[in-house]
From Swiss-Prot:
This is one of the proteins that bind and probably mediate the attachment of the 5S RNA into the large ribosomal subunit, where it forms part of the central protuberance. In the 70S ribosome it contacts protein S13 of the 30S subunit (bridge B1b), connecting the 2 subunits; this bridge is implicated in subunit movement. Contacts the P site tRNA; the 5S rRNA and some of its associated proteins might help stabilize positioning of ribosome-bound tRNAs. Part of the 50S ribosomal subunit; part of the 5S rRNA/L5/L18/L25 subcomplex. Contacts the 5S rRNA and the P site tRNA. Forms a bridge to the 30S subunit in the 70S ribosome. The lineage of its organism: Bacteria, Bacillati, Actinomycetota, Actinomycetes, Mycobacteriales. GO terms for molecular function: rRNA binding; structural constituent of ribosome; tRNA binding. GO terms for biological process: translation. The keyword tRNA-binding applies. Pfam families: Ribosomal_L5 (PF00281), Ribosomal_L5_C (PF00673). Keywords: Ribonucleoprotein, Ribosomal protein, RNA-binding, rRNA-binding, tRNA-binding. Belongs to the universal ribosomal protein uL5 family. This is Large ribosomal subunit protein uL5.
Length: 187
């Protein structure tokens, strides 16, 4: 890419969403307007303790989905009941920032989430009190980068969207404006 390219969700955030949030919460300073800092995609592979080949599939899937090489996560301590030893690989994690983060969020919201069967929206109760949002996906096949015929097994993942919002209301407003499909509150 020789030309300057800005992801469309980032452009929409800068041009439309920031002004809407400023009007809604009336901030004293433009630096107080919440934004997205990073997106962390975590894939736990507990079965890798018994079969070490399973972690390779998770690493490949995460690489395809995020476009970035995942970090191998290892067990911090041994747990005999799970047949787990300290240092064994049990998961993979990717931290996305900058343009890759905006591209991933755009693909997640416009392509992946609508492909989930019987999808009724994300819960808006999974905020951590500081405006960060975490949700889980049960399988990786909703991403179009994954070839359904080549996956060895369905794997879920946790996705955390870290924002600069100071509370849940600001974080919820930011993510709703970005296009996160939250469930409607039933009266």
């Amino acid at each position: 890419m020789s030309e300057n390219y800005t992801p469309r969700l980032k452009t929409r955030y800068r041009e439309e969403i920031r002004t809407k949030l400023n009007d809604e919460f009336s901030y004293e300073n433009v630096m107080q307007i919440p934004g997205v800092v990073k997106v962390v995609v975590n894939m736990g592979v507990g079965d890798a303790a018994r079969d070490s080949k399973l972690i390779n599939g998770a690493l490949e899937d995460l690489t395809l989905i995020t476009g970035q090489k995942p970090e191998l996560r290892r067990a911090k301590k041994s747990i005999a009941n799970f047949k787990l030893r300290e240092g064994m690989p049990i998961g993979a994690r990717v931290t996305l920032r900058g343009d890759r983060m905006w591209e991933f969020l755009d693909r997640l919201l416009t392509v992946a989430l609508p492909r989930i069967r019987d999808f009724r929206g994300l819960s808006d109760q999974q905020f951590d009190g500081h405006g960060n949002y975490t949700f889980g996906l049960s399988e990786q096949t909703m991403f179009y980068e994954i070839d359904v015929d080549k996956i060895d097994r369905p794997r879920g993942m946790d996705i955390t969207v870290v924002t600069t919002a100071t509370n849940n209301e600001e974080g919820r407003a930011l993510l709703r404006e970005l296009g996160f499909p939250f469930k409607k509150a039933d009266a």
